Amino acid sequence: MSCTRGWRLILLGLLCVGLLGTRGQDESRKVSVQYNPGSSDTSVNVVHVRAVGDGNTIHYVWSTLGTPTVLLIYTHSETSQLQVNWTKLLSPAPQGALRVEPEESVSYATALLFTRIFEYQDVNNTANFSGTDEKYFYPPYNLSEFLWENANATVNATSLSANLTGSNTTDPSGSFHNGSVSFRISAYNTSGRDSSPPRLRHTANCTKLEFLVSGVRPRGNNSRFALEMVTIEKEGRRKMKSVLSIDDEYTPTIFEMMQLVAVAPNSSHARGFLQWKSVAYGSPSGSRADLLPCQLYPLQPLNATFTATSIAHAYFGDDLADAYNLEAFNISFGIADGDFYDKHEFLSWSALIGYGDPPRDSFSILVICIMAVALGTPLLLLIIGTVLVTAVRHKVYPNYQPIN
């Protein structure tokens, strides 16, 4: 009886630990995905993800018009709608072309821009992006200059997904002859864990972006890549945060989760976040052998030098560089003494962009069972040993005659 009770207590405790990370993050939403709302023009891509919750709506607006960008707009209304003035959006002055109505329902808005891809020659195989001499860098790929495919055929209302795929048609080296860069978008209507590596845990308050470089011919035999992004915040700035875990079940040898969280000193409401596991993959299979650690570099203020155009200007307006905080950061992919990009000519990196608290990872049932066995076996042996010793000490021998 004591043994059984001990096992039950151990298993119950581990289940509580495993489920603690998901408590309060099980909100569901009614999600829809729409391509170019209000327009039949397929020369540009605007993908609108609308996620309606209990008394609020999160709007995600993805576009490859200018610099590839995702807008996140949170409203405290279940009926808020995205309005697009297509004439103005496609004009040289797109400011004000995007808005969410009713405007007074908007309580938070942010944006993430994907500006450039860096390629450098890692001559010493150190994967040290920031420490590499400038002479080993190739001219960066400016994503605003890419030619982007029509994404309409990739929009899937059932899987809540879409693909934005483009290539550099002006590169004299012809690196994109059979290659492309893609942003795969996946939305979620409830909490869960993604099916593809790195198996990120998500909630209904976020969407996943997967950045892929596939089939692009490297400009050197030992090339590595890095991605430059820009964040936009009205109040406050983004803060880097590293979250460590003892569990590497889904990403072997990788124990770190990185987060960029918006921080405002006087804000009373939640804000946006970007979250990812510190890992990328060098093959489509996402196998352990092709796992690539990735490195985040410090945020850099960008207001005075920001010139890129995107749908962020269409929403935030003319005073974007003056009234908002813009910060750039880089993520590089690769590990010292590891394989270079040319092994498979493939790179995949995934992240979550969302509103509120970033998802908290939790132990799977398999890990909980393993921990229960590992922790419970010594306790079980101790209990059995104690019972046996006690039984022997109190055992009455019938042939024993006490000495007077």
Curated annotation (Swiss-Prot):
Residues 1-24 form the signal peptide. Residues 25-364 are lumenal. The chain crosses the membrane at residues 365-385. One of its GO terms (cellular component) is lysosome. Glycans are attached at residues 85, 124, 128, 142, 152, 156, 163, 168, 178, 189, 205, 221, 266, 303, 330. A motif (Lysosomal targeting motif) lies at residues 400-404. It comes from the Eukaryota. Residues 386-404 are cytoplasmic. It is found in: Lysosome membrane. It is a single-pass type I membrane protein. Pfam families: NCU-G1 (PF15065). GO terms for biological process: protein localization to lysosome; protein stabilization. Interacts (via lumenal domain) with lysosomal protein MFSD1; the interaction starts while both proteins are still in the endoplasmic reticulum and is required for stabilization of MFSD1 in lysosomes but has no direct effect on its targeting to lysosomes or transporter activity. Required to protect lysosomal transporter MFSD1 from lysosomal proteolysis and for MFSD1 lysosomal localization. This is Glycosylated lysosomal membrane protein B. It comes from Xenopus laevis. The lineage of its organism: Eukaryota, Metazoa, Chordata, Craniata, Vertebrata.
